[in-house]
Amino acid sequence: MDPTNSPQEPPHTSTPGPFDGPQWPHQAPRGMYLSVAVLMGIVVISASVVNGLVIVVSIRYKKLRSPLNYILVNLAMADLLVTLCGSSVSFSNNINGFFVFGKRLCELEGFMVSLTGIVGLWSLAILALERYVVVCRPLGDFRFQHRHAVTGCAFTWVWSLLWTTPPLLGWSSYVPEGLRTSCGPNWYTGGSNNNSYILTLFVTCFVMPLSLILFSYANLLMTLRAAAAQQQESDTTQQAERQVTRMVVAMVMAFLICWLPYTTFALVVATNKDIAIQPALASLPSYFSKTATVYNPIIYVFMNKQFQSCLLKMLCCGHHPRGTGRTAPAAPASPTDGLRNKVTPSHPV
């Protein structure tokens, strides 16, 4: 195909358009594309396995189907869709060195990755809010029921649709980004149309959920510390408090590590059109955010002992490896287990 026919490139250039042919060595060396393909391949396999396990185990074991666990399944579904619609597409494109599926599917990929990514992001915020309401009891003796959980899950999808559909209708757009093997919101063009959308997206889909997470977990930690202070200051209690603190810090840091580089890059590029950023460097925040689909279920689900028990029973065909026969011996609950399950819910507190 004649590269001068591509609408993405000015005439008289030897660089193919992002949908026309390999972008190496014009954007980056071929080795860079293959390295990203390897990373995306690892993410696709790992995220598909861990999120698939979360969904299957939650469906199979009734005791995991509590209202407070709905949001964890919602998060796993969103992460699985990001993997299927984003990471797998990026894997194929990086092997070929360009966006092989064409402009229309570029827009669809950008939309689907943004939609499901923001659903996952807001799922983390709703989970934090649920933990705050259940543990800190600002509403008194309020119990989450199925309708509350369904409402929370529905909100994440409706809110995300509200802010990811406009680029399909003319308010900004979805375009190839970085190495030009994945698509996302148009941070690059500038102008009031794009800048107003980027600013709105930043506030509604990053600042707001981050504020909710920080508020909820800060109050949760203070409540748990106050409860621990009323108990005997034994080594076990202190260990439980330290473990919960580390878990909360891990949750917040995982959120920031995933989304802060991406949003920072977007704002810098959107507000400084003259800045020159290497394509490989510009791609890092986007690809790095996709790795959250692997560690989200590990932090929020696999660290919960009740889920671990159900997972082991399923993988071992009903036989618990830590016990004899088909059931595991009951172990007394420790303060560590109790406080940890307040942060990563397996059942209402």
UniProtKB/Swiss-Prot annotation:
Membrane topology note: Multi-pass membrane protein
Transmembrane segment boundaries: 33-57, 70-94, 110-129, 149-172, 197-224, 247-270, 279-303
Source organism superkingdom: Eukaryota
Ranges annotated as biased composition (Polar residues): 1-16
Entry comment on modification after translation: Phosphorylated on some or all of the serine and threonine residues present in the C-terminal region.
Annotated keywords: Chromophore, Disulfide bond, G-protein coupled receptor, Glycoprotein, Lipoprotein, Membrane, Palmitate, Phosphoprotein, Photoreceptor protein, Receptor, Retinal protein, Sensory transduction, Transducer, Transmembrane, Transmembrane helix
Annotated lipid attachment (S-palmitoyl cysteine): C316, C317
Entry-listed glycosylation sites: N194
UniProt topological domain (Cytoplasmic) ranges: 58-69, 130-148, 225-246, 304-349
Record carries keyword Protein transport: no
Region Disordered, residue ranges: 1-22, 325-349
Similarity comment: Belongs to the G-protein coupled receptor 1 family. Opsin subfamily.
Record-given protein name: Pinopsin
Organism, as annotated: Columba livia (Rock dove)
